From Swiss-Prot:
The active site is at S106 (nucleophile), H131. Cleaves peptides in various proteins in a process that requires ATP hydrolysis. Has a chymotrypsin-like activity. Plays a major role in the degradation of misfolded proteins. Fourteen ClpP subunits assemble into 2 heptameric rings which stack back to back to give a disk-like structure with a central cavity, resembling the structure of eukaryotic proteasomes. The lineage of its organism: Bacteria, Pseudomonadati, Pseudomonadota, Alphaproteobacteria, Hyphomicrobiales. NCBIfam families: clpP (TIGR00493), PRK00277.1 (NF001368), PRK12553.1 (NF009205). It is an enzyme of class 3 (hydrolase). Its EC number is 3.4.21.92. The gene is clpP. It comes from Bartonella henselae (strain ATCC 49882 / DSM 28221 / CCUG 30454 / Houston 1) (Rochalimaea henselae). One of its GO terms (molecular function) is ATPase binding. This is ATP-dependent Clp protease proteolytic subunit.
Length: 210
């Protein structure tokens, strides 16, 4: 069975832009990158993390003060890959605005709440899910024990990150993330994962004057 994400990417539309040097063709994601929009779509893994981090660093180099928009529709994925994106978001100078469309689950929810304070949004019918990290190991008993200790440390670190960005106390975060916990957009706002639920794009000053 073919990968639906790869199938979708093979059908990415091209857009034509008129410039004083003539016409130039972009795939739609490259054109949106010019507008400082980055997509996290699908499972979070090393390949995606590499591309997202590279785009964040490029946009910082292009303009270290202008906001970057991160659109998220992800079921989550590899913790270390997600942490690479998270650390890069915190490391760069431009503020990163996040918006959930569809779902932000597991590492997707952590990246959603990691946006700049006051700039974390979700669309009204999006779904957010938080839980503790999971993993499976095999091998010698001593190695399994070390892996178990490591995942417990990772769980504690993830809990601390959620505490930092939501304002909830540690016990609430630990209890909420103990099992898969699904939230509506409004519930995610009340919990502190996002700052607002938006249904319509706000008008720009130019549109208001027109």
């Amino acid at each position: 069975m073919s990968d639906p994400i790869k199938t979708a990417l093979s059908l990415v539309p091209m857009v034509i832009e008129q410039t004083n040097r003539g016409e130039r063709a972009y795939d739609i994601f490259s054109r949106l990158l010019k507008e400082r929009i980055i997509f996290i779509n699908g499972p979070v893994e090393d390949g995606m993390a590499m591309l997202v981090c590279a785009q964040l660093l490029f946009l910082e180099a292009e303009n270290p003060k202008k906001e970057i928009s991160l659109y998220i529709n992800s079921p989550g994925g590899v913790v270390t890959s997600g942490m690479a994106i998270y650390d890069t978001m915190q490391f760069i100078r431009p503020p990163v605005s996040t918006l959930c469309m569809g779902q932000a689950a597991s590492m997707g929810s952590l990246l959603l709440t990691a946006g700049a304070k006051g700039h974390r949004f979700t669309l009204p019918n999006a779904r957010i899910m938080v839980h503790q990290p999971s993993g499976g190991f095999q091998g010698q008993a001593s190695d399994i024990e070390r892996h178990a200790q490591d995942i417990i440390k990772m769980k504690q670190r993830l809990n601390e990150i959620y505490v930092q960005h939501t304002g909830q106390n540690y016990d609430v975060i630990e209890r909420t993330l103990d099992r898969d916990h699904f939230m509506t957009a409004e519930e995610a706002k009340q919990f502190g994962l996002v700052d607002d639920v938006i249904q319509y794009r706000a008008e720009t000053e130019k549109e208001e004057k027109d």
